[in-house]
């Protein structure tokens, strides 16, 4: 019995552009190493100019007529591209959702501590999930919980905007606050 396996290819990997002798066009629009346009030349002339400069001839745009090629150091070009992608990935921050739990009888001191933490989360660019849990007979006084969440919303108006208004899920009231966009 023969088991056929599929070869997995990395979907992110882009095909490399044709380089030097691998370019199939007879004529190309050439851009020099300095970025200046040389004009339309034969492929042999373009490869000769690239070899004189001790650089590579790289096909930039195969769709154009004639194809656009550039004289450059291809290895250095790949390195710079990889470096830029790494910097972009490093600078990309994933916003997390941080949760703070309240109770209907949360005292003023505890409220202020939790509020400070919410301010810190929002100023760091994270979303904040404010949950208020009811126990036992506290469910009969849901309006106290709503008042507390309205107070939290009012206290955080300069740091964030309410993304999800207070909503009762089982024995919990929940609200999500997103940080304000920086200008």
Swiss-Prot record:
Its main location: cytoplasm. The keyword Nucleotide-binding does not apply. It holds the Pfam family IF3_N. It comes from the Bacteria. GO terms for molecular function: ribosome binding; translation initiation factor activity. IF-3 binds to the 30S ribosomal subunit and shifts the equilibrium between 70S ribosomes and their 50S and 30S subunits in favor of the free subunits, thus enhancing the availability of 30S subunits on which protein synthesis initiation begins. This is Translation initiation factor IF-3. It comes from Pseudomonas aeruginosa (strain ATCC 15692 / DSM 22644 / CIP 104116 / JCM 14847 / LMG 12228 / 1C / PRS 101 / PAO1).
């Amino acid at each position: 019995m023969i088991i056929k396996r599929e070869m997995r290819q990395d979907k992110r990997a882009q095909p490399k552009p044709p380089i030097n002798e691998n370019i199939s066009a007879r004529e190309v629009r050439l851009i020099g190493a300095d970025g200046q346009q040389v004009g339309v030349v034969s492929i042999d002339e373009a490869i000769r100019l690239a070899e004189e400069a001790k650089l590579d001839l790289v096909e930039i745009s195969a769709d154009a007529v004639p194809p656009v090629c550039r004289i450059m150091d291809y290895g250095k070009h790949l390195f710079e591209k990889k470096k830029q992608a790494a910097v972009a990935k490093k600078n990309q921050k994933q916003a997390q959702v941080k949760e703070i739990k309240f109770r209907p009888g949360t005292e003023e001191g505890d409220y202020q501590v939790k509020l400070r933490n919410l301010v810190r989360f929002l100023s760091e660019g994270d979303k904040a999930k404010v949950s208020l849990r009811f126990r036992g007979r506290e469910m009969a006084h849901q309006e106290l919980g709503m008042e507390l969440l309205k107070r939290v919303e009012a206290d955080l108006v300069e740091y964030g905007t309410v993304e999800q208004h207070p909503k009762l899920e089982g024995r919990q009231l929940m609200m999500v606050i997103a940080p304000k966009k920086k200008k």
